[in-house]
A protein has these predicted regions:
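Nuclease and nuclease-like effector domains acting on nucleic acids or nucleotide cofactors
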Residues: 1-273, 282-361
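Short hydrophobic beta-strand that contains or immediately precedes a catalytic carboxylate
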Residues: 276
Length: 361
């Protein structure tokens, strides 16, 4: 137990979202899909989703009802979402293989719909609707779906559709009657985060994909502490993720329980060039206030003599680690929150590598 609630200092590690700097870059069709079965199933990460469907074909039917040819093809589509704008992009590609038999003059047709949005909410570049198809050719369009007219602190869940089929300009061929559909309904756009100048900026993610915060040798002592804390039973793995707490007052209460700034506990822990590191993070629902009587430490080198080395699923861990590393790790966490658009109550997991314990006090 700590000796009462105390104030939190301004030099606590910063963990507010940071969205300054360039947006992340990626490709529409990446190994995320290229290395998976091409079976028409979507694969998603936090800011990227894609799908490939091969071995498709449509039969060409003439006006007498006879099957006279075949159009084999593969569909590839990918969506990229940004963490600092409300415009997400989708590439839709159809690769045509060797056309067989009599195929007439087939055309590539498509229709775009963007649910519950005003006119002008998307733009399209690439193949024209109704353009002629040739064997060995690809038809590619890139759609910019725009979600930028959002009030501050708003959330939206856009649904976008690309419907497509094959027409035919040959009067002796019946145009295709069935339409394929590429539907994206798992994007979330929000305007809850701000640039350093205080301006709110929209961003979009695939909200069903849980982001992963990677701790490395860039902050070895903090990485080590988190590794040991999770190994002792605390949450943070993919199967038991943390959940972001955006309320500053609740984050401060977490810190007050785990890392008091004043009093006998703080005085006994204090070491030159070290600062108090708590896990689970103060910026998570699972922070110290969730189980204030279940504090622990993970090693004698942590210099937290008021807590014992123990294990268990609930509680929190405290370790005195290098102060500069602690501050830098807080900045990295804020950058992670911003780039992955981890908003209030979003789940996230951790991966650690390259940790090293603090020295003997």
């Amino acid at each position: 137990m700590h000796d009462g609630v105390t104030t939190v200092s301004a030099d606590d590690p910063p963990d507010d979202p940071i969205i300054d700097g360039p947006d992340t870059q990626a490709t529409f069709i990446s190994p995320l899909c290229l290395d998976q079965a091409w079976d028409g199933k979507w694969h998603a990460e936090r800011k990227h989703a894609c799908m490939i469907w091969k071995d498709l074909a449509v039969d060409v039917i003439d006006t007498k009802g006879a099957e006279v040819g075949t159009i084999p093809f593969t569909v590839k589509t990918g969506v990229l979402t940004p963490h600092k704008s409300g415009e997400f992009q989708q590439e839709f590609r159809v690769d045509f293989h060797g056309l067989t038999g009599k195929t007439g003059k087939p055309t590539f047709r498509y229709k775009l719909t963007y649910n519950n949005t005003p006119a002008g909410s998307y733009s399209v570049e690439g193949a024209d609707d109704g353009s002629l198809i040739k064997s060995g050719q690809s038809k590619v369009i890139v759609v910019k779906w725009k979600q930028q007219a959002m009030a501050d602190e708003a959330l939206k869940y856009p649904v976008v559709n690309i419907d497509w089929n094959f027409g035919n300009l040959d009067p002796e061929i019946i145009p295709g009657q069935q339409w394929g559909n590429s539907r994206v309904a798992t994007v979330r756009c929000d305007s809850t985060m701000k640039l350093s100048n205080g301006t709110s900026r929209q961003g979009c993610v695939f909200y069903g994909a849980t982001p992963e915060f990677k701790l490395t040798s860039a902050t070895p002592e903090q990485t080590w502490h988190v590794t040991e804390a999770i190994a002792s039973g605390l949450p943070g793995s993919a199967s038991r993720p943390l959940h972001r707490q955006a309320d500053k007052s609740k984050r401060d209460i977490n810190r007050q329980y785990s890392c008091p700034r004043k009093g006998a506990v703080a005085d006994a822990r204090r070491l030159t060039s070290r600062s108090c590191d708590e896990y689970p993070f103060a910026s998570s629902n699972e922070g110290a206030a969730a189980h204030p009587d279940l504090g622990r430490t993970v090693h004698d080198n942590c210099n937290v003599k008021d807590l014992t080395i123990t294990t268990g699923r609930d509680g929190y861990s405290v370790c005195m680690i290098d102060a500069k590393q602690n501050s830098h790790s807080g900045s990295l966490l804020g950058k992670f929150y911003g780039e992955e658009r981890v908003i209030d109550q979003d789940a996230f997991s951790l991966a650690t590598s390259g940790g090293a314990p603090p020295g003997i006090p």
